[in-house]
Design a protein with these regions (language model features):
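Hydrophobic alpha-helical segments
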Residues: 2-272
Length: 272
């Protein structure tokens, strides 16, 4: 019995050590899963950016602004590269039904673009982006990113960016269609622009949105709304399609820059 005493003392220590090791391994596995989620979000952000650009350029080209055709072709190629990059992050996405549906929707959209009206093209792009944003939310939940401090403020930036992205497409359409004297289309699109402008202002009144946006971006958005009001909502549009598209893109690029900063901070917290 005396020989067993040292062993019986060691066993509890070994058990505790084993549990500690298992706990550390589980924690590390969970952390790796969160980091993988961040990588997917970063890739999805690039896809959203290019889908939004494609929507705006399509609105111009289908409305008759052929000067935007070359840019549209380049952005289209970039979307396909984004899809390949997302597929390369991991197997989870390759087998995800919603992701496969998004890719299929994009392929159908490209194949039918030449037959779509401006409004239908904008609608299809917006529906596609809405589905990508829903998948972004699922990625965040599935990979427990909301458990990370500051791990959800970036999401409101995507919502704001999509509002601005829709305004870019509608504004480009107005500036293009106006050149062809389609007053009915211009008036309808103006109403849509006014609704989006109000959506943005309402969102900016929310403390959650204010927490994630910096002062420079807040002012930039407000300035952009004033620009839209002055150039597109007063009498005849006072800006060309390419000029409006470029101005809206500046606002969007800064919002996405802020998004990248916030997601980078999440990644840094997980990596240390």
């Amino acid at each position: 019995m005396g020989e067993l005493a040292p062993i019986t003392k060691i066993i509890p220590v070994l058990v505790v050590t084993a549990f500690m090791v298992i706990g550390m391994m589980l924690h590390q596995t969970a952390r790796q899963k969160q980091i993988l989620g961040v990588l997917w979000l970063q890739a999805m952000r690039r896809l959203i950016t290019h889908l939004q650009r494609h929507r705006g350029l399509s609105a111009g080209v289908l409305g008759g602004e052929q000067a935007l055709e070359e840019n549209l072709s380049e952005v289209r190629k970039q979307v396909f590269k984004d899809i390949d990059a997302i597929n390369g992050v991991g197997e989870w996405m390759n087998q995800h039904a919603d992701w496969l549906s998004i890719v299929e929707h994009w392929t159908r959209l490209i194949g039918s673009m030449h037959r779509l009206s401006v409004s239908d093209a904008i609608h299809q792009h917006t529906l596609l982006i809405k589905n990508v944003l829903a998948l972004v939310d699922e990625i965040a939940v599935e990979h427990h990113l909301h458990d990370v401090p500051g791990g959800s403020q970036w999401r409101d930036l995507l919502t704001l960016a999509e509002y601005v992205g829709q305004m870019r497409a509608l504004g480009t359409a107005i500036a293009t269609v106006a050149n062809h004297q389609d007053e009915i289309a211009v008036n309808k699109t103006r109403e849509d622009l006014q609704e989006l402008s109000q959506e943005i202002l309402t969102s900016l009144d929310s403390p959650n949105y204010r927490a994630g946006i910096d002062g420079d971006n807040l002012q930039r958005i407000l300035d952009f709304l004033s620009y839209v009001d002055a150039q597109l909502l007063k009498d005849a549009p006072g800006v060309e399609a390419s000029g409006f598209y470029a101005e809206a893109t500046k606002t969007l690029d800064q919002l996405f820059k802020r998004f990248d900063q916030q997601l980078s901070q999440v990644h840094q917290r997980l990596a240390h």
